[in-house]
C-alpha cells in the first residue's frame, strides 16, 4: 500500500469517471474505477456527458486475478427493516428484484453485474469490459468485512492519498 501511495500520479480526487479522465489527460497511466461507470461512459451517461464516450474508448479495462481467485464485484443489495410498516409488499418487491427479469433489467440499465447466477451481464459489459470472459471472486462479503478495520488502519498509517 505504501508503494502504491508513492506511485500515485495525482492525489485521489473526483469520482470514478474523473479517474478515467485523468488517464486520458495524461495525469496518470492507470486508474482504479468501478466498471459500471464504463457502461455509463460508453453511452455518454444518457447524453449528459458525450465527451466521456471517447474517454471510455481511449482506455482498456483490466480485471485483476483472472488466472486465480477472480476480481471483486461490488453489489447492490436490498434489506427489510424490522419495523417496516408494509412488510408483505416489501417482501414482494424484494422477490421481484431478485427475479431473473429484474436482474436482467438492472444489469442492462445500470451496467452492474447481476447478483443472481445465470442472469447475463449487459451486452455492453460483456463486449467491452470483459471480452466475454470474466471471473468474479467468490469470497463472501462477510469475510471481506472482517478486514475493514485493519484496512482502514493501514490506509491511515501510510497516509494514503496525501
Regions found by a protein language model. Name each.
Residues 1-64:
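Ligand-binding pocket segment of bilobal, Venus flytrap-like solute-binding proteins
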Residues 2, 20, 24, 32, ...:
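Non-transmembrane alpha-helical segments in soluble domains
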Residues 13-17, 32, 83-88, 100, ...:
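Soluble non-cytosolic domains of exported or imported proteins
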Residues 36-39, 66-69, 85, 99-100:
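Solvent-exposed loop/turn segments at secondary-structure junctions
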Residues 52-86:
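Flexible, solvent-exposed loop/hinge segments that line or gate ligand/substrate-binding clefts
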Residues 76-138:
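Mature extracytoplasmic/periplasmic domains
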Residues 120-162:
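Extracellular/periplasmic bilobal clamshell ligand-binding domains
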Amino acid at each position: 500500500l505504501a508503494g502504491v501511495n508513492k506511485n500515485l500520479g495525482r492525489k485521489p480526487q473526483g469520482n470514478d469517471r474523473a479517474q478515467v479522465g485523468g488517464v486520458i489527460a495524461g495525469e496518470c497511466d492507470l486508474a482504479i474505477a468501478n466498471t459500471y461507470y464504463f457502461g455509463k461512459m460508453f453511452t455518454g451517461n444518457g447524453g449528459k456527458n458525450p465527451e466521456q464516450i471517447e474517454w471510455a474508448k481511449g482506455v482498456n479495462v483490466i480485471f485483476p486475478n483472472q488466472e486465480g481467485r477472480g476480481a471483486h464485484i461490488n453489489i447492490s443489495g436490498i434489506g427489510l427493516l424490522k419495523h417496516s410498516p408494509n412488510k408483505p409488499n416489501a417482501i414482494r418487491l424484494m422477490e421481484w428484484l431478485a427475479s431473473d427479469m429484474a436482474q436482467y433489467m438492472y444489469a442492462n440499465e445500470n451496467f452492474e453485474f447481476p447478483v443472481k447466477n445465470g442472469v447475463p451481464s449487459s451486452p455492453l459489459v460483456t463486449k467491452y469490459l470483459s471480452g466475454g470472459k470474466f471471473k468474479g471472486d467468490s469470497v463472501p462479503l462477510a469475510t471481506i468485512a472482517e478486514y475493514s478495520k485493519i484496512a482502514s488502519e493501514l490506509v491511515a498509517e501510510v497516509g494514503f492519498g496525501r
